[in-house]
Amino acid sequence: MKNKNSEQNTHSTIGEQDIHYFHEGKHIYAYEFMGAHKACEEGIEGIRFTTWAPNAKSICVIGDFNYWQVEDKNYMEPITDAGLWSVFIPNAKNGDKYKFVVTNKDTNHYVYKSDPYAFFSELRPNTASIITTETQYTWSDDKWLEKRAKTNYYDNPMNVYELHLASWKTKNGKFLTYDELSETLPQYIKEMGYTHVEFMPLHEHPLDASWGYQPTGFYSVNSRHGDIIGLKRLVDKLHNNDIGVILDWVPGHFCKDQHGLIYFDGSPCYEYQEPTKAINKGWGTHNFDLGRNEVKCFLISNAMYWINEFHIDGLRVDAVSNILYLNYDREDGQWIPNIYGGHENLEGIAFLKELNGVLKHTCKGVITIAEESSSWPDISTPIEKGGLGFDFKWNMGWMNDTLRYISLDPVYRKYHHNLITFSMVYHYSEKFILSISHDEVVHGKKSLINKMWGDLWNKYAGLRLYMSYMIGHPGKKLIFMGSEFVQFVEWREYEQLQWQVVDQYESHKQTLHFFKKLNDFYHNETALWQCDYNHHGFRWIDADNSQQSILSFIRSSKDNKQKLIFICNFTPVTYYDYHLGVPDAGSYKEVFNSDNLEFGGSGQVMATEIFSSPQSSHGFEQRITIKIPPMATLVLKLIK
């Protein structure tokens, strides 16, 4: 997958084809020659620095190697008229800190900038880039990569654990290193039964409270946890435990701290020229100019960098709506329509298609996931069929509706029954992932357990009911860390999760056990993931029982040999002698019950098989009569 261009120009060791494709916006390995790279020129070893700054008058490299002095010999030379600059510095070496002094050609004003392509950077509050040439790692995940290339994720289990590294666990209040995380995280994820971990952004960012979503160093590994080798070792360890790694990736906007990409050459460079398009007031950031060739190279090469160098298995693309809409988070008069008079960002659309097209062509088995909150059509439709080409899309509508529903007093749920059923009306329009992410447990939104209605018992029961319903609902799954053991406080990025409650309180231990059993149940039952995006895989038994707030539906495998019947009771009422239509004659056995005593429930379980009778119900010729426990999900399976 490496770039093989080798033709040289007269100015540097950068290939002529590299330069051509870079300015054409078609280079997908720009990180191989942009930034700081070890070189030997005319028999002398050193570092070649290369950057792009089309409106620069001059650029000087300063750093540890020259005592941070501006010297004539360290000024870059312009390679092209389109803004590519480069210089070879003999005495620069691995580990040296450095910056670029960029002078604007119109104002003569100069700025001190970090290297946009730096592989490593100083820990905040310091902002220098660090020469990093020792990045080789001996991987041991060949079997995983081979399996990944052959996997069809649509008909395989996908149960994602979303994770913020800095606050998952700490050591005496300090960040764990990637190596320390390697000793505990893979084992925990595997024991809990998750198939993937999703890391919130791992590129360098100055503000902890931004969670990584306002980056400055897109190619720089988050220095809070260690170095490049440490992160590679962590990913390798996860792969060796059969755990996929998804990375939150932010290609729409960037932090406006002065050492970063903002006005890199003293004028709009990585951002749009037009202020109404460039300035993102809502987030206090700048939007990338996605129509500029060199910016597209920067971003698509960045995606390739994380995938190639760190063996990342998928990218969750952040804030896709901000890329698609010119009027995103803007009032009338604060945005300029496109050439057709619409609000669609044509450059953003083209960029997303190009990104997904490149990854599909070059990175077999790597997936892309859109975090997109609007009703934009065909997000996960292939490019050749007119879509954007993402593999999956987060189902924000399902999340909003169902979280609202479970917060209601059960007395009033009958009047809002559509909130829990409406998702199946549009489910097959996209390849949805059901996500309960970090955004839902911060900023006054309450922790997941505190979203539940009722006293403490009903909150725990409601959580088990809701999670079991989620497992049964078609679509892949994602849950944010801490929910699995019932963290009561909202997520706080500045401290570790409240792991101590698992040892202190039986209810937390029981819920952690519940999540493990639920995840194992999901993984072991083909019907729960093989036909997520095929109408064959789901059928309502009764979607309309609003009076009792009970849902019932069937999940089926491709060959129809496995069928699971879900009954979800969203009230604290036990229903006796409940008649339920079933698709097949025979005996049915309980295979999962969220009311089980071992989970902290009331223990109203079905100890014996139930036989169907030839009586019509819910459109079926057979029916069973069961007891439905309160605030619980009951799952039955035909056994003979």
Swiss-Prot record:
For biological process, the GO terms are:
glycogen biosynthetic process
Catalytic reaction equation(s): Transfers a segment of a (1->4)-alpha-D-glucan chain to a primary hydroxy group in a similar glucan chain
Q: What is its EC number?
A: 2.4.1.18
Q: What class of enzyme is it?
A: transferase
Q: Pfam families, alphabetically?
A: Alpha-amylase, Alpha-amylase_C, CBM_48
Which residues catalyse the reaction? 318 (nucleophile), 371 (proton donor)
Example GO molecular function: cation binding
Q: In which pathway does it act?
A: Glycan biosynthesis; glycogen biosynthesis
Query: Which keywords does UniProt give here?
Result: Carbohydrate metabolism, Glycogen biosynthesis, Glycogen metabolism, Glycosyltransferase, Transferase
Q: Do you know which InterPro entries this protein is assigned to?
A: A-amylase/branching_C (IPR006048), Branching_enzy (IPR037439), GlgB (IPR006407), GlgB_N_E_set_prok (IPR044143), Glyco_hydro_13_cat_dom (IPR006047), Glyco_hydro_13_N (IPR004193), Glyco_hydro_b (IPR013780), Glycoside_hydrolase_SF (IPR017853)
List GO terms (cellular component aspect).
Answer: cytosol
Give the top-rank taxon of the lineage listed in the UniProt record for this protein.
Answer: Bacteria
Summary of the function given for this chain in its UniProt record: Catalyzes the formation of the alpha-1,6-glucosidic linkages in glycogen by scission of a 1,4-alpha-linked oligosaccharide from growing alpha-1,4-glucan chains and the subsequent attachment of the oligosaccharide to the alpha-1,6 position.
Q: How does it assemble?
A: Monomer.
Its family remark reads: Belongs to the glycosyl hydrolase 13 family. GlgB subfamily.
Q: What is this protein called?
A: 1,4-alpha-glucan branching enzyme GlgB
Name the species this protein comes from. Francisella tularensis subsp. tularensis (strain WY96-3418)
